[in-house]
């Protein structure tokens, strides 16, 4: 299972993958992310060209981010290009407006998604949605990380 995460700050965002470390300079993308409300926003990246985020994006920001994902998938792809979305929220990821918009675009392009946040601690919960699987990672300061992978394609 390829799973990675990196926190987004005003400087570089670091993401680790199974066999690759990706260094993203978040300042390059600050023109379409509302940095004032990006607390808790995550960017993920891995060696087969998957990258995603959820944050408070405007409609223009969603369009720019969609183009950004396409470009990075082209640049990083050493296998079949795929999208990835990661969310950090106390609510279901598909209920986030920006994420829902991106998912809707991807569904029109033939991608399939399923699942939602289940259980977990309200302090911190992460959901990674892939085109062919769903990984649910729940963690809190008091418990170990529990991961559940659901293949549905």
Where are the language model's segments positioned?
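Active-site microenvironment for binding and transforming phosphate-containing groups
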Residues: 1-153
């Amino acid at each position: 299972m390829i799973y990675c995460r990196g926190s987004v700050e005003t400087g570089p965002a670091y993401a680790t993958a199974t066999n690759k470390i990706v260094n993203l300079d978040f300042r390059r993308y600050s023109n379409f992310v509302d940095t004032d409300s990006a607390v808790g926003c995550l960017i993920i990246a891995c060696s087969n060209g998957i990258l995603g985020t959820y944050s408070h994006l405007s409609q223009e920001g969603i369009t720019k981010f969609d183009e950004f994902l396409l470009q990075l998938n082209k640049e990083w792809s050493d296998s079949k290009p795929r999208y990835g979305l990661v969310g950090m929220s106390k609510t279901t990821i598909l209920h986030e407006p920006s994420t829902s918009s991106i998912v809707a675009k991807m569904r029109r392009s033939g991608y399939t998604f399923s699942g939602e946040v289940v259980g977990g601690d309200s302090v911190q919960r992460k959901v990674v949605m892939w085109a062919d699987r769903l990984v649910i990672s729940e963690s809190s300061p008091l418990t170990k990380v529990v991961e559940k992978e659901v293949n549905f394609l």
